[in-house]
């Protein structure tokens, strides 16, 4: 419980800092695409869940996060089958008004490329014109930054966040 509380507080702090630095933001008028890892049931005890920390946190998001998240629901989003997850995210989120994206750069890169291809557009702002913030962590974004700048189509804000267990 304290782990979850700590991560949710970190998320609230990050969004509060963003809002303070960008008071005219429309971040909270749209949806937030959050990419997570996968979950598994422990065969020794079905009540025990094992998996990536991002998936465990997303499974227990508070209501004030859940109603902004795209896509909604948890099943396919935490699937071990990356292709199933990727297809679901891209198909569902393409229709939403995404303002924020959060996740590991390599995962987000695949999602963005797929959505651009599926919608036959030049950049992601043709699909999500209000996209303004990319929250990233898990690995350094430096090697991905030129790709994202090209795929996004216009400047956005980047906020880096690392758990105590992560580094680069």
Where are the regions a protein language model picked out?
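Active-site phosphate/ATP/adenylate-binding loop shared across adenylate-forming ligases
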Residues: 1-168
């Amino acid at each position: 419980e304290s782990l979850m509380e700590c991560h949710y507080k970190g998320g609230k702090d990050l969004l509060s800092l963003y809002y303070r630095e960008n008071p005219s933001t429309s971040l909270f008028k749209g949806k937030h695409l959050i990419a997570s890892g996968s979950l598994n049931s422990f065969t020794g005890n079905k009540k025990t869940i094992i998996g990536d920390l991002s998936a465990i946190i997303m499974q227990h998001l508070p209501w004030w996060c859940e109603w902004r998240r795209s896509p909604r629901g948890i099943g396919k989003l935490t699937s071990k089958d990356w292709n199933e997850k990727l297809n679901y995210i891209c198909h569902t989120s393409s229709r939403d008004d995404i303002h924020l994206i959060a996740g590991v750069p390599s995962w987000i890169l695949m999602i963005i490329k797929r959505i651009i291809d599926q919608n036959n557009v030049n950049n992601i702002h043709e699909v999500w014109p209000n996209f303004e913030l990319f929250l990233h962590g898990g690995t350094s974004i430096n090697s991905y930054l030129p790709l994202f700048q090209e795929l996004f189509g216009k400047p956005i804000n980047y906020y880096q966040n690392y758990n105590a267990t992560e580094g680069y």
